[in-house]
Regions:
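Bacterial N-terminal signal peptides that target proteins for export
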Residues: 1-8
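N-terminal secretory signal peptides
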Residues: 25-77
Length: 170
């Protein structure tokens, strides 16, 4: 009888532990099997938490999540982002990002000038989420993403009062 009780206790303990670390269900990007995404994924071991939110398991290749409930989702393997005049392009920690804030308080940040692209979906709600600056300012996360070589970078946009510089004439 003690063996049966011990086995039941082990099963119960395993169930409790499994309940504490639920897997985040995500879909892999089309290019998730790119070897550069594997390089990023391996280096995400150096990012155990972001803004106080612990990393969680995901069920899709080249993805990651932080927080319970998840406040940061990462997907590697998207097509390289094209230049745009509608999205803000920012640089932080050596990585350029296109920022889509059309679904506030959620932000979608996609690397610019890297192939394949990495995308972050961030709950930026001050009450329940995490600061986007804490996410993209995380040095270990930036170092992981920077393993994908940059081919383009953000350029400064002229302000509304900028005067165009005339091109030289011959």
């Amino acid at each position: 009888m003690p063996r049966l009780a011990s086995a039941a206790l082990l099963v119960l303990a395993a169930g409790v532990l499994a309940g504490c670390s639920s897997t985040v269900h995500l879909n892999p990007a089309e290019g998730a099997n790119d070897s550069r995404c594997a390089d990023v994924t391996v280096r995400l071991q150096n990012v155990p938490s972001i803004g106080g939110h612990d990393r969680r398991w995901t069920d899709a290749q080249a993805t990651a999540a932080w927080g319970d409930p998840a406040v940061v989702l990462l997907t590697c393997g998207l097509p390289e982002a094209a230049p745009t005049s509608t999205l803000q392009c920012i640089s932080l920690q050596g990585v350029d990002w296109l920022v889509d804030d059309s679904k506030q308080p959620y932000l979608t940040l996609t690397t610019y000038g890297r192939k394949p692209a990495v995308q972050l979906y961030i709950d930026n709600d001050p009450k329940t989420g995490v600061s986007a600056n804490d996410v993209i300012g995380n040095k270990s996360l930036a170092a992981a993403i920077a393993t994908i070589p940059a081919t383009h970078s953000c350029t400064a946009r002229p302000g509304p009062d900028a005067v165009p510089t005339p091109a030289p004439t011959n």
